């Protein structure tokens, strides 16, 4: 059972047209939608086997999000800019418990090559898992064995996405400034989403860990913030549902998902399905400033 009664609620506006600086996600809905989208995208993908692995993993996340024991909300930085980034080592036992459940459920669903990785990860010490989890949350992906990152992040995502909505209710959103990293947990975004509510054309960045979304003005670089030298790219036409916004100053880029036109889209699944866009931008000297929880590519800097 979750306990949050000791944290006072912060009053806010009830206007349906007010721009919300920060939006909470329902992890069960997110994971179910993501699993369905992965199944749909796999049909025409050369990465169909990997999409299926991710679908099974995300389906287990949905199951855990619904019925796992998350204990009580631990001490968090309620006066800090990114409150859930400051969870102490006490959180490790909870997400590591989720990791063991996730791996146990996944083990009979995968082939032997992946099963060996799963069994090896299940044998790691709590201290080692804590260290790897901390490195991933800090963006130091290359410090963690690549074959473990996907599963560790998935377990942490279930834990952090469970608590994020409750913490958001208790944050003073008037103090949430435009920023590159998640204002709730401090992690990288997956991509931008362009929505039609409460007003058409608003952009939000979607967190790779806690699944929260925060407003970010369009035509501004989501990494360095400049707004003078920005370029939009797409594979087919200017109205593509997935486009890339690149910065000529810092040479970073982020994808934009126009979910207002295609509600079935999911940031992680559709990012994975459009890796050809990444290849094109990488060849031009640009680098992603985002992180996909289904890919966990090692940083290049």
Swiss-Prot record:
Keyword annotations from UniProtKB, A to Z: Cytoplasm
Subcellular locations according to the entry: Cytoplasm
Major site of localization recorded for this protein: cytoplasm
GO CC term (a single one): cytosol
Alphabetized GO MF terms: ferric iron binding
Family under the similarity heading: Belongs to the FdhE family.
One biological process term in Gene Ontology: protein maturation
The protein's name in its UniProt record: Protein FdhE homolog
Domain of life: Bacteria
Function noted in UniProt: Necessary for formate dehydrogenase activity.
InterPro entries hit by this protein: FdhE-like_sf, FdhE_C, FdhE_central, FdhE_N, Formate_DH_accessory
């Amino acid at each position: 059972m979750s306990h949050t009664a000791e944290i006072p609620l912060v009053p806010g506006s009830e206007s349906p047209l007010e721009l919300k600086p920060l939006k909470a996600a329902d992890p069960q809905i997110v994971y179910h939608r993501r699993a369905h989208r992965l199944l749909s995208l796999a049909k025409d993908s050369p990465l169909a086997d990997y999409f299926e692995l991710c679908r099974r993993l995300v389906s287990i996340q949905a199951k855990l999000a619904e019925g796992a024991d998350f204990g009580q909300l631990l001490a968090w930085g309620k006066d800090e800019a990114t409150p859930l980034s400051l969870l102490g080592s006490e959180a490790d036992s909870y997400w590591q418990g989720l990791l063991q459940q996730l791996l146990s459920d996944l083990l009979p669903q995968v082939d032997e090559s992946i099963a060996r990785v799963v069994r090896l990860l299940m044998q790691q010490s709590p201290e080692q898992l804590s260290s790897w989890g901390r490195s991933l949350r800090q963006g130091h992906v290359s410090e963690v064995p690549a074959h473990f990152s996907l599963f560790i992040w998935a377990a942490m995502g279930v834990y952090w996405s469970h608590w994020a909505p409750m913490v958001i209710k208790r944050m003073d959103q008037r103090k949430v400034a435009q920023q590159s990293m998640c204002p709730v947990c401090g992690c990288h975004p997956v991509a931008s989403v362009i929505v039609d509510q409460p007003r058409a054309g608003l952009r939000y960045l979607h967190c790779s860990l806690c699944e929260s979304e925060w407003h970010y003005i369009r035509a501004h670089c989501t990494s360095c913030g400049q707004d003078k030298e920005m370029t939009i790219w797409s594979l087919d036409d200017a109205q593509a549902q997935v486009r890339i916004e690149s910065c000529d100053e810092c040479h970073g880029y982020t994808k934009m998902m126009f979910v207002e036109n295609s509600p079935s889209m999911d940031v992680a699944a559709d990012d994975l399905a459009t890796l050809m866009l990444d290849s094109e931008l990488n060849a031009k000297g640009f680098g992603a400033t985002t992180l996909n929880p289904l890919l966990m590519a090692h940083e290049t800097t």
